[in-house]
């Protein structure tokens, strides 16, 4: 792998990447839910058993946090000249994520646009698909990233 940064000009529409391996633990599910999403199906085995989840499941927001960690690790490994993100256009939680699941991510660059007002940066739209260890699609998202242009 090159030590050179990946810039806006290096991104190609349609390019894909697969990365990450994040194993969700029961402790993480309970800790995250207790602090940020204390719904009973995230916290109680007994309650979760009476729902369509069937057992304790991770909060969708916890799933997003795990995905974010894998994305940042990938960006750091690829040495992308990233400048953050103005947000998501779409987010879907398709299947529950359970303690013990191992997640991975596949991304695709949808398109990129140079900034008209900030020549030092551009933006790109990407689609992410999140799979568990059984290759079941558990979440999808479309987001916008900001990235530095070469020479700026």
Give names to the regions the model predicted.
Residues 1-13, 96-152:
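HotDog/MaoC-like acyl-thioester-processing domains
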Residues 2-87, 152:
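Hot-dog-fold acyl-thioester-processing enzymes
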Residues 59-66, 94-103:
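Short, charged low-complexity intrinsically disordered segments located at boundaries
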